[in-house]
Design a protein with these regions (language model features):
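Non-catalytic, conserved peripheral segments adjacent to functional cores
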Residues: 1-105, 123-127, 134-204
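Short beta-strand His + acidic residue motifs that chelate non-heme Fe in jelly-roll/DSBH
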Residues: 107, 115-120
Length: 204
């Protein structure tokens, strides 16, 4: 059985340790099941694929009406999370974790937690969401190198899109554009054991 554990750094973010099964033909692995999160009544509405060259950084992005579930199908990325929910007990904490071929983790990101990733190699990220893409109303950004947040990307010179390069620092974003609540994801039922993330789970 796959195991799931809530982040010790950001409340409501979850990491699923995935377990492949292989034989002489190859291997098989479940990467997502709705019943891994049995207390969440959600509808999966869209699945996306993002291909990135090594050195590309995408983010930081956040949503008011969408949760994400990430799985890296090729290569390795360093995922970065920032809790932007004012009423959260982990407000403004940050976390990075390396996920991909050599650390096969599914990453659940709740509403109000900013997220992004640095491609450590050429990489493919697949992710499912519970709302349709809405570029006008629910695609928001914060500067990847915000000095008040200090996300540990491990680089000072990533490849950025023009849009991400123009993202503002958190202190310069109007309060009405930031998440207001704590989010809407309860703890899962106690069906799963803890997982060991290893040295990639690092910064507060």
């Amino acid at each position: 059985m796959d195991s799931i554990e809530e982040s010790k750094i950001i409340r409501g973010a979850y990491m699923v340790q995935l377990h492949p099964f292989g034989d002489e033909r190859g291997r098989f692995m479940e990467t997502f099941r709705k019943d891994w999160f049995p207390q969440r009544n959600w509808d999966i509405l869209q699945m996306n694929r993002s291909d990135s060259k090594a050195g590309v950084l995408r983010g930081l992005h956040y949503h008011h009406h969408q949760v994400d579930y990430w799985y890296v199908t090729r290569g390795m990325v360093r995922a970065g999370l920032v809790d932007l929910r004012p009423s959260s007990p982990t407000y403004r904490r940050t976390q990075t974790i390396e996920i991909g071929e050599f650390n096969e983790i599914g990453l659940f990101i709740p509403i109000g937690v900013a997220h992004g990733f640095l491609a450590l190699t050429d990489a493919t990220l697949t992710y499912i969401v519970d709302n349709y893409y809405d570029n006008g109303r629910d695609e928001n950004g914060i500067a990847w190198n915000d000095p008040d947040l200090q996300v540990d990307w491990g680089t000072n010179n990533p490849i950025l899109s023009r849009r991400d390069a123009a993202n503002a620092f958190l202190r310069d974003i109007p309060a009405e554009k930031l998440p207001r609540g704590y989010g809407r994801f309860p703890r899962p039922c106690g069906l799963f054991g803890p997982i060991t993330i290893g040295p990639s789970e690092n910064k507060v």
